């Protein structure tokens, strides 16, 4: 099947100033600033920085001229995610198949090559301004080589002497790979995009939550999680539900030029406590979880684990509370998670740091606490 998806190849951000964004993501989240394509490599209309950590690859792109497509998008949406790129065996065939399945082309297949190998990319549009690029890699640019520090594509060069890289190697944040990637769409549009992922990319529904699961007194949302066949690529889709006041999804849409987009990127760690402690030390701002959350969480979580024959949470309760981490369990095990505040001035994109101990769900038991924390922030911004 041409649409066999191997992995998340990279996540492309459009940003106003990639040099400064690269410094932020390196300093705050421990990414290595590895490669660059800019004026020095012959790229005349945009600059791109490749940041890596574990199997996570962020590509930060900024316009060098006002005619580059990223210039208009940064004006409309601020900094944010443009492209969740997917590694496939043959990008051209994957793109053809997706278009036959009803997908709309974002750009036609194009191949960049040199004597050592080639990279072919082709894109389709999903909700709002978001694109899925299909990426196939050959020779020196194949995925195993890339994971070992090989060049991203012809036209990139390695970054030498970026001082934070050594510091980040010695003080790792421990982020391993993209766990899932959440989109916000307009009211009434979630099922349309669920069907789109089924029809166009062959995804299947993995989980779903409705406003009974995710509601406070004020705001609610509905969410369905779409996953690729190998479950490596998960794309939850949120829509607002009717509440007394504006939901966080509605707030996102309003500050994202009334356009759907990527709300957050969840990054996986094997050690939530170590990762969060290191990120806090680096000055990352996380949502403040109400103290009352910890009064009932252990009973709820360990009770669920016991009922399904699992061991209790092994992380030290006090450390979990001190670091403000959320815990949830289901029949398969438990998870630990925490959400940053927005990563730019607009209340749009944020990150989630997640650790799974058996659980494959998304922290349903935390939705309420999370919403209360989000609403407190929303109120401070005057967006209720």
What residues fall within each predicted segment?
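N-terminal beta-strand motif that seeds the catalytic metal site of vicinal oxygen chelate
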Residues: 1-19, 81-84, 145-194, 258-268, ...
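Core segments of cupin and vicinal oxygen chelate
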Residues: 3-6, 12-57, 100-101, 109-115, ...
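Vicinal oxygen chelate
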Residues: 6-16, 49-50, 69-96, 122-125, ...
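A structural feature that tracks compact, well-ordered secondary-structure segments
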Residues: 24, 61-63, 70-73, 85-89, ...
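ER-lumen resident redox/N-glycosylation machinery signature
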Residues: 36-37, 67-75, 135-136, 172, ...
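Hydrophobic, ordered structural segments
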Residues: 69, 77-163, 170-172, 182-184, ...
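Active-site-adjacent "gating/activation" loops or surface patches in catalytic cores
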Residues: 159, 230-251
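Long compositionally biased, domain-poor regions of proteins
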Residues: 233-235, 255-343, 349-357
């Amino acid at each position: 099947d041409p649409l066999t998806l191997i992995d998340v190849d990279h996540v492309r951000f459009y940003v106003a100033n990639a040099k400064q964004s690269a410094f932020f993501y390196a300093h705050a989240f421990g990414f290595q600033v590895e490669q660059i394509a800019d004026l020095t490599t012959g790229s005349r209309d945009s600059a791109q920085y490749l940041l890596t950590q574990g199997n996570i690859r962020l590509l930060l792109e900024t316009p060098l001229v006002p005619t580059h497509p990223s210039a208009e998008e940064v004006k409309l949406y601020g900094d944010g995610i443009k492209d969740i790129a997917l590694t496939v065996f043959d990008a051209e065939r994957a793109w053809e198949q997706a278009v036959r399945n009803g997908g709309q082309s974002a750009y036609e297949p194009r191949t960049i090559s040199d004597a050592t190998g080639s990279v072919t990319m082709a894109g389709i549009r999903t909700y709002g301004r978001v694109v899925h690029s299909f990426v196939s890699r050959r020779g020196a640019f194949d995925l195993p080589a890339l994971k070992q520090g090989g060049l991203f594509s012809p036209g990139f060069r390695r970054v030498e002497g970026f001082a934070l890289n050594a510091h980040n190697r010695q003080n790792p944040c421990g982020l391993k790979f993209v766990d899932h990637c959440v989109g916000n769409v307009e009211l009434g549009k979630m099922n349309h995009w669920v069907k789109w992922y089924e029809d166009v990319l062959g995804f299947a529904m993995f989980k779903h939550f409705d406003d009974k699961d995710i509601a406070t007194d004020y705001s609610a949302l509905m969410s369905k999680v779409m996953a690729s066949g190998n479950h490596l690529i998960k794309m939850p889709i949120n829509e607002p539900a009717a509440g007394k006041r504006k939901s966080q999804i509605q707030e996102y849409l309003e500050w994202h030029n009334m356009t759907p987009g990527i709300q957050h990127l969840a990054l996986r760690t094997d050690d939530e406590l170590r990762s969060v402690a290191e990120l806090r030390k680096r000055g990352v701002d996380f949502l403040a979880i109400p103290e009352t959350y910890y009064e009932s969480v252990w009973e709820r979580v360990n009770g669920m684990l016991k009922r399904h024959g699992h061991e209790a949470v092994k992380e030290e309760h006090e450390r979990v509370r001190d670091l403000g981490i959320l815990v949830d369990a289901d029949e398969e095990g438990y998870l630990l998670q925490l959400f940053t505040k927005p990563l730019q001035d607009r209340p749009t994109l944020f990150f989630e740091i997640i650790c799974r101990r058996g659980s494959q769900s998304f922290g349903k038991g935390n939705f309420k606490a999370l919403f209360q924390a989000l609403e407190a922030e929303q109120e401070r911004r005057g967006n209720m």
